[in-house]
Amino acid sequence: PDASEEELNAAFKHNTRAMFGETIANPALTVLDIEKFAKAAHAHNVPLIVDNTFPTPINCRPIEWGADIVTHSTTKYMDGHGAAVGGAIVDSGNFDWMAHADMYPGLCTPDESYHGITYAEKFGKEGAFITKCTSQLMRDLGCIQSPQNAFILNLGLESLHVRMPRHVENGQAVAEFLENHPKVEYVSYPGLKSNKYYETAKKYMPNGGCGVVSFLSLIHI
């Protein structure tokens, strides 16, 4: 996330098809400057995909900052108990696949396994990607939750808006305690004013990020 615009642009190759980042990276807890990365991705005609697992949509909405596709590991905060493995894909419908048809043949040429449909033509940019995910990729890969796992996830989602502020509050308290502990060498938590990503975190996550704290102890086991 610390790359300059020049470094970002230099990273793109002729076969680059997407840019990927994490809102808050695990485990380093670096914070993505979503607008900067979206600008770079779109300048090279590729979508920005953001993993928003740690903040969840309660604390950050990457699509509003330029992300095209957002992913979540629902096993963490959305589930709330780590009881059911799962994931989610959210498509903004903003990326124009057909405008770059030569780069995305899977979306812009007929899919013979699905009645010869060309997703970008049939569903437009608003539905091409997510329809391919649900109609073809889920069919071929089998990534469908069991009814019990879906039930557990739905229960967790009901309380997500209540739990996330508490997670942030607890994470902040733990981070501040560790930062002042003589046996701790370094603490990484975007909510600390001493953290290099503090201002970026406040921009994209004004209500806080998550409850995860990373630290380096002076105690060697």
Short names for language-model regions:
Residues I219-I221:
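Conserved small/polar residues in nucleotide/adenosyl-binding loops
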Residues P1-N180, S188:
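Conserved PLP-enzyme active-site core in the AAT-like
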Residues V90, S214-L216:
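Short hydrophobic/aromatic beta-strand micro-patches
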Residues Q172, S188-V213:
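Conserved glycine-rich beta-strand-loop-beta hairpin in the small C-terminal domain of fold type I
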Residues G106, G116, E121, G191, ...:
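Intrinsically disordered, low-complexity regions enriched in small/polar residues
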